[in-house]
Amino acid sequence: MFMGPTGVVVDQLFQSVHLSRDEVYMTNLIKCRLPGNRKPKREEIERCSFYLDREIEIVRPRLLIPMGYYATCYLLDRYGLTHTPAKEQIGRLYVSGSFLIYPVRHPSALLHNPSLRDEMFKDFERIPLLSE
């Protein structure tokens, strides 16, 4: 999960808030690698979402941090939260029952647009406060 250059970005983001991968539970919305690293189709999300829902039931997190558009849209839809334009979802805190949802950009965004660096690290600065 999050390997190569994207994995390096993930590690840097978590290290910036004094967390490591060992301290967080990470999973994917889509459980298989898609051909050509393409974006997931609606039916693929529908087929895989059962597993994510089950993981959330088992782990019972207090804070969900969806990384990227598809994970964010799925979770906001799943828990009946107001859907705002994608750009407005990033860094916004949503409350759903017993947990919080705090969407952030997908880490690969930094590889495609290095000018997002400060914003992405700033969004991560809130995570330790939200997880208390």
Describe the predicted segments one by one.
Residues M1-E132:
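A polyanion-binding, active-site-adjacent surface
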